[in-house]
From Swiss-Prot:
GO MF annotation list: rRNA binding
GO biological process: cell differentiation; mitochondrial ribosome assembly; positive regulation of mitochondrial translation
Location of the protein in the cell: Nucleus; Secreted; Mitochondrion membrane
Quaternary organization: Forms a regulatory protein-RNA complex, consisting of RCC1L, NGRN, RPUSD3, RPUSD4, TRUB2, FASTKD2 and 16S mt-rRNA. Interacts with 16S mt-rRNA; this interaction is direct.
Function: Plays an essential role in mitochondrial ribosome biogenesis. As a component of a functional protein-RNA module, consisting of RCC1L, NGRN, RPUSD3, RPUSD4, TRUB2, FASTKD2 and 16S mitochondrial ribosomal RNA (16S mt-rRNA), controls 16S mt-rRNA abundance and is required for intra-mitochondrial translation of core subunits of the oxidative phosphorylation system.
Domain of life where this protein originates: Eukaryota
The protein's name in its UniProt record: Neugrin
Chief location of this protein within or outside the cell: nucleus
Species of provenance: Rattus norvegicus (Rat)
Keywords attached to this entry: Developmental protein, Differentiation, Glycoprotein, Membrane, Mitochondrion, Nucleus, Phosphoprotein, Secreted, Signal
Amino acid sequence: MALSLSLFLGGRVRAAVARCGFASQGVAGPGSISREPDPDSDWEPEERELQEVESALKRQKKAMRFQKIRRQMEAPGAPPRTLTWEAMEQIRYLHKEFAESWSVPRLAEGFDVSTDVIRRVLKSKFIPTLEQKLKQDQKVLKKAGITRVVWQLPVSEDTLKPLSAGHPMSGPLLMPGDEVSSNSQTHSRALKVKSNAPSAEAQKKREEKNKRIRVLAESLVPTTTALGHQRELQKYTTHDSEADRRANNHILPSVEKLEELEAGEPGDQNFSSKVVQKGREFFDSNGNFLYRI
Protein backbone atom coordinates (compact mmCIF):
# COMPACT_ATOMS: atom_id res chain seq x y z
CA MET A 1 0.00 0.00 0.00
CA ALA A 2 2.79 2.40 0.93
CA LEU A 3 4.74 1.41 -2.15
CA SER A 4 1.83 2.06 -4.44
CA LEU A 5 1.19 5.47 -2.79
CA SER A 6 4.83 6.51 -3.19
CA LEU A 7 4.80 5.50 -6.83
CA PHE A 8 1.62 7.49 -7.41
CA LEU A 9 3.01 10.65 -5.75
CA GLY A 10 6.30 10.28 -7.59
CA GLY A 11 4.47 10.17 -10.90
CA ARG A 12 2.50 13.34 -10.05
CA VAL A 13 5.67 15.21 -9.05
CA ARG A 14 7.47 14.17 -12.22
CA ALA A 15 4.51 15.35 -14.31
CA ALA A 16 4.44 18.73 -12.50
CA VAL A 17 8.17 19.18 -12.97
CA ALA A 18 7.85 18.36 -16.65
CA ARG A 19 5.06 20.93 -17.07
CA CYS A 20 7.16 23.57 -15.28
CA GLY A 21 10.06 22.83 -17.55
CA PHE A 22 7.92 23.23 -20.66
CA ALA A 23 6.38 26.50 -19.40
CA SER A 24 9.64 28.10 -18.28
CA GLN A 25 11.46 27.51 -21.51
CA GLY A 26 11.04 31.19 -22.54
CA VAL A 27 13.05 32.46 -19.56
CA ALA A 28 15.74 29.79 -19.61
CA GLY A 29 19.40 30.68 -19.83
CA PRO A 30 21.42 30.87 -23.02
CA GLY A 31 22.79 27.37 -22.50
CA SER A 32 19.44 25.68 -21.99
CA ILE A 33 17.94 23.30 -24.47
CA SER A 34 14.93 24.73 -26.33
CA ARG A 35 11.75 22.73 -26.06
CA GLU A 36 8.44 22.97 -27.81
CA PRO A 37 5.63 24.45 -25.66
CA ASP A 38 3.06 22.02 -24.43
CA PRO A 39 -0.35 23.03 -25.84
CA ASP A 40 -2.12 21.25 -22.96
CA SER A 41 -0.09 23.00 -20.28
CA ASP A 42 -1.94 25.35 -17.87
CA TRP A 43 1.25 27.13 -16.75
CA GLU A 44 1.78 29.31 -19.88
CA PRO A 45 -0.90 32.02 -19.23
CA GLU A 46 0.10 32.19 -15.58
CA GLU A 47 3.72 32.64 -16.58
CA ARG A 48 2.72 35.44 -19.00
CA GLU A 49 0.77 37.25 -16.29
CA LEU A 50 3.72 36.89 -13.94
CA GLN A 51 6.03 38.47 -16.50
CA GLU A 52 3.62 41.37 -17.04
CA VAL A 53 3.46 42.02 -13.30
CA GLU A 54 7.25 41.94 -13.06
CA SER A 55 7.65 44.41 -15.95
CA ALA A 56 5.06 46.74 -14.40
CA LEU A 57 6.91 46.66 -11.08
CA LYS A 58 10.18 47.42 -12.85
CA ARG A 59 8.67 50.42 -14.63
CA GLN A 60 7.19 51.69 -11.38
CA LYS A 61 10.51 51.38 -9.57
CA LYS A 62 12.28 53.16 -12.42
CA ALA A 63 9.77 56.03 -12.35
CA MET A 64 10.07 56.36 -8.57
CA ARG A 65 13.86 56.43 -8.84
CA PHE A 66 13.66 59.11 -11.54
CA GLN A 67 11.29 61.24 -9.44
CA LYS A 68 13.59 60.95 -6.45
CA ILE A 69 16.63 62.01 -8.46
CA ARG A 70 14.75 64.95 -9.94
CA ARG A 71 13.61 66.13 -6.50
CA GLN A 72 17.20 65.98 -5.32
CA MET A 73 18.41 68.00 -8.30
CA GLU A 74 15.72 70.69 -8.06
CA ALA A 75 15.64 73.47 -5.50
CA PRO A 76 13.57 72.79 -2.37
CA GLY A 77 10.08 74.17 -2.18
CA ALA A 78 7.55 75.01 -4.85
CA PRO A 79 8.88 76.18 -8.25
CA PRO A 80 8.63 79.90 -9.04
CA ARG A 81 5.26 80.94 -10.42
CA THR A 82 5.25 81.90 -14.10
CA LEU A 83 1.49 82.02 -14.78
CA THR A 84 -1.13 84.44 -13.58
CA TRP A 85 -4.34 83.21 -12.02
CA GLU A 86 -6.27 84.17 -15.11
CA ALA A 87 -3.97 82.02 -17.26
CA MET A 88 -4.39 79.10 -14.86
CA GLU A 89 -8.18 79.44 -15.04
CA GLN A 90 -7.95 79.39 -18.83
CA ILE A 91 -5.83 76.23 -18.68
CA ARG A 92 -8.36 74.46 -16.43
CA TYR A 93 -11.28 75.58 -18.57
CA LEU A 94 -9.73 74.45 -21.86
CA HIS A 95 -8.61 71.10 -20.49
CA LYS A 96 -12.03 70.47 -18.96
CA GLU A 97 -14.22 71.54 -21.87
CA PHE A 98 -11.92 70.65 -24.80
CA ALA A 99 -9.78 67.83 -23.47
CA GLU A 100 -9.22 66.23 -26.87
CA SER A 101 -8.04 69.34 -28.69
CA TRP A 102 -6.26 70.93 -25.70
CA SER A 103 -4.03 68.20 -24.33
CA VAL A 104 -1.28 68.76 -21.78
CA PRO A 105 1.53 69.09 -24.38
CA ARG A 106 -0.50 71.55 -26.45
CA LEU A 107 -1.36 73.63 -23.37
CA ALA A 108 2.32 73.67 -22.41
CA GLU A 109 3.22 74.85 -25.90
CA GLY A 110 0.46 77.47 -26.00
CA PHE A 111 1.29 78.99 -22.61
CA ASP A 112 5.08 78.60 -23.04
CA VAL A 113 5.61 76.48 -19.93
CA SER A 114 6.64 72.90 -19.24
CA THR A 115 4.24 69.98 -19.04
CA ASP A 116 5.00 69.62 -15.32
CA VAL A 117 3.65 73.12 -14.71
CA ILE A 118 0.46 72.29 -16.62
CA ARG A 119 -0.02 69.10 -14.58
CA ARG A 120 0.51 71.01 -11.33
CA VAL A 121 -2.09 73.58 -12.40
CA LEU A 122 -4.63 70.91 -13.32
CA LYS A 123 -3.98 68.98 -10.11
CA SER A 124 -4.16 71.99 -7.78
CA LYS A 125 -7.48 72.73 -6.05
CA PHE A 126 -6.31 75.75 -4.06
CA ILE A 127 -8.59 78.81 -4.18
CA PRO A 128 -6.77 81.93 -2.96
CA THR A 129 -8.25 85.18 -1.76
CA LEU A 130 -8.32 88.36 -3.82
CA GLU A 131 -5.31 89.82 -2.03
CA GLN A 132 -3.31 86.64 -2.56
CA LYS A 133 -4.18 86.63 -6.26
CA LEU A 134 -3.14 90.25 -6.73
CA LYS A 135 0.07 89.74 -4.78
CA GLN A 136 1.07 86.60 -6.68
CA ASP A 137 0.15 88.13 -10.04
CA GLN A 138 2.20 91.20 -9.20
CA LYS A 139 5.23 88.99 -8.58
CA VAL A 140 4.69 87.17 -11.87
CA LEU A 141 4.32 90.39 -13.87
CA LYS A 142 7.29 91.99 -12.13
CA LYS A 143 9.41 88.98 -13.00
CA ALA A 144 8.22 89.22 -16.60
CA GLY A 145 9.38 92.86 -16.81
CA ILE A 146 6.11 94.74 -16.18
CA THR A 147 6.64 97.10 -13.25
CA ARG A 148 3.18 98.64 -13.09
CA VAL A 149 1.74 98.57 -9.57
CA VAL A 150 -1.76 97.16 -9.20
CA TRP A 151 -2.18 98.31 -5.63
CA GLN A 152 -2.48 101.93 -6.70
CA LEU A 153 -5.64 101.30 -8.71
CA PRO A 154 -8.62 102.95 -7.00
CA VAL A 155 -11.28 100.40 -6.07
CA SER A 156 -14.49 101.82 -4.66
CA GLU A 157 -17.32 100.07 -2.86
CA ASP A 158 -19.62 100.53 -5.86
CA THR A 159 -17.13 98.61 -7.96
CA LEU A 160 -16.85 95.77 -5.46
CA LYS A 161 -20.64 95.29 -5.11
CA PRO A 162 -21.25 93.79 -8.58
CA LEU A 163 -18.09 91.73 -8.17
CA SER A 164 -19.32 90.17 -4.95
CA ALA A 165 -22.63 89.34 -6.68
CA GLY A 166 -20.76 86.87 -8.93
CA HIS A 167 -21.67 88.21 -12.38
CA PRO A 168 -20.19 86.42 -15.41
CA MET A 169 -16.96 87.85 -16.66
CA SER A 170 -16.38 88.56 -20.33
CA GLY A 171 -12.64 88.59 -19.94
CA PRO A 172 -9.97 87.71 -22.49
CA LEU A 173 -10.41 83.94 -22.22
CA LEU A 174 -9.43 81.73 -25.09
CA MET A 175 -12.95 80.31 -25.25
CA PRO A 176 -15.96 82.56 -24.52
CA GLY A 177 -18.98 81.64 -22.45
CA ASP A 178 -17.23 80.89 -19.16
CA GLU A 179 -18.40 82.25 -15.82
CA VAL A 180 -15.80 82.78 -13.10
CA SER A 181 -15.83 84.01 -9.55
CA SER A 182 -15.73 87.60 -8.38
CA ASN A 183 -12.06 87.25 -7.45
CA SER A 184 -11.03 86.37 -10.99
CA GLN A 185 -13.21 89.20 -12.35
CA THR A 186 -11.49 91.78 -10.13
CA HIS A 187 -8.11 90.40 -11.11
CA SER A 188 -9.06 90.50 -14.79
CA ARG A 189 -10.05 94.16 -14.56
CA ALA A 190 -6.83 95.02 -12.74
CA LEU A 191 -4.76 93.24 -15.37
CA LYS A 192 -6.73 94.89 -18.16
CA VAL A 193 -6.12 98.38 -16.77
CA LYS A 194 -2.48 97.55 -16.21
CA SER A 195 -1.96 96.13 -19.69
CA ASN A 196 -3.78 99.04 -21.36
CA ALA A 197 -1.71 101.70 -19.58
CA PRO A 198 1.54 101.12 -21.54
CA SER A 199 -0.33 100.90 -24.85
CA ALA A 200 -2.13 104.20 -24.13
CA GLU A 201 1.13 105.95 -23.37
CA ALA A 202 2.75 104.52 -26.49
CA GLN A 203 -0.22 105.65 -28.59
CA LYS A 204 -0.01 109.14 -27.10
CA LYS A 205 3.71 109.35 -27.86
CA ARG A 206 3.13 108.22 -31.44
CA GLU A 207 0.41 110.84 -31.93
CA GLU A 208 2.65 113.61 -30.59
CA LYS A 209 5.48 112.48 -32.83
CA ASN A 210 3.21 112.38 -35.90
CA LYS A 211 1.88 115.84 -35.03
CA ARG A 212 5.39 117.28 -34.84
CA ILE A 213 6.25 115.66 -38.16
CA ARG A 214 3.13 117.15 -39.80
CA VAL A 215 3.88 120.64 -38.44
CA LEU A 216 7.46 120.40 -39.64
CA ALA A 217 6.31 119.19 -43.06
CA GLU A 218 3.76 122.01 -43.35
CA SER A 219 6.41 124.57 -42.41
CA LEU A 220 8.78 123.15 -45.00
CA VAL A 221 6.23 123.06 -47.85
CA PRO A 222 5.94 126.89 -48.35
CA THR A 223 9.70 127.29 -48.11
CA THR A 224 10.23 124.56 -50.66
CA THR A 225 7.58 126.08 -52.94
CA ALA A 226 9.13 129.54 -52.69
CA LEU A 227 12.57 128.13 -53.42
CA GLY A 228 11.14 126.31 -56.41
CA HIS A 229 9.50 129.48 -57.76
CA GLN A 230 12.68 131.46 -57.17
CA ARG A 231 14.74 128.86 -59.02
CA GLU A 232 12.26 128.87 -61.90
CA LEU A 233 12.34 132.68 -62.07
CA GLN A 234 16.14 132.69 -62.01
CA LYS A 235 16.15 130.04 -64.71
CA TYR A 236 13.76 131.96 -66.94
CA THR A 237 15.53 135.28 -66.23
CA THR A 238 18.88 133.78 -67.12
CA HIS A 239 17.39 132.23 -70.23
CA ASP A 240 15.78 135.53 -71.26
CA SER A 241 18.98 137.50 -70.66
CA GLU A 242 20.98 135.03 -72.72
CA ALA A 243 18.38 135.17 -75.48
CA ASP A 244 18.41 138.99 -75.43
CA ARG A 245 22.18 139.05 -75.55
CA ARG A 246 22.21 136.66 -78.48
CA ALA A 247 19.50 138.66 -80.21
CA ASN A 248 21.44 141.87 -79.64
CA ASN A 249 24.54 140.28 -81.08
CA HIS A 250 22.72 138.93 -84.12
CA ILE A 251 20.11 141.65 -84.64
CA LEU A 252 19.86 143.18 -88.08
CA PRO A 253 21.08 146.77 -88.38
CA SER A 254 18.57 149.47 -88.93
CA VAL A 255 17.95 151.12 -92.31
CA GLU A 256 19.72 154.33 -91.25
CA LYS A 257 22.82 152.38 -90.29
CA LEU A 258 22.82 150.56 -93.63
CA GLU A 259 22.50 153.86 -95.48
CA GLU A 260 25.37 155.33 -93.49
CA LEU A 261 27.46 152.28 -94.22
CA GLU A 262 26.67 152.43 -97.90
CA ALA A 263 27.11 156.22 -98.16
CA GLY A 264 30.26 156.21 -96.07
CA GLU A 265 31.57 158.93 -93.78
CA PRO A 266 34.03 161.42 -95.24
CA GLY A 267 36.05 161.73 -92.00
CA ASP A 268 36.70 158.03 -91.66
CA GLN A 269 39.59 157.05 -93.85
CA ASN A 270 39.62 153.39 -92.73
CA PHE A 271 36.02 152.85 -93.63
CA SER A 272 35.11 151.39 -97.03
CA SER A 273 31.67 151.73 -98.54
CA LYS A 274 31.93 148.33 -100.17
CA VAL A 275 29.99 145.56 -98.40
CA VAL A 276 30.92 141.98 -99.11
CA GLN A 277 28.39 139.18 -98.45
CA LYS A 278 29.58 135.71 -97.50
CA GLY A 279 26.60 133.44 -97.00
CA ARG A 280 24.45 135.04 -94.35
CA GLU A 281 27.25 137.26 -93.02
CA PHE A 282 28.25 140.69 -94.29
CA PHE A 283 31.77 142.17 -94.14
CA ASP A 284 33.26 145.49 -95.25
CA SER A 285 36.06 145.80 -97.75
CA ASN A 286 38.60 145.54 -94.94
CA GLY A 287 37.16 142.20 -93.78
CA ASN A 288 35.51 143.51 -90.64
CA PHE A 289 32.31 141.71 -89.60
CA LEU A 290 29.25 143.86 -89.92
CA TYR A 291 26.17 141.77 -89.29
CA ARG A 292 24.51 138.45 -89.90
CA ILE A 293 21.09 137.68 -91.40
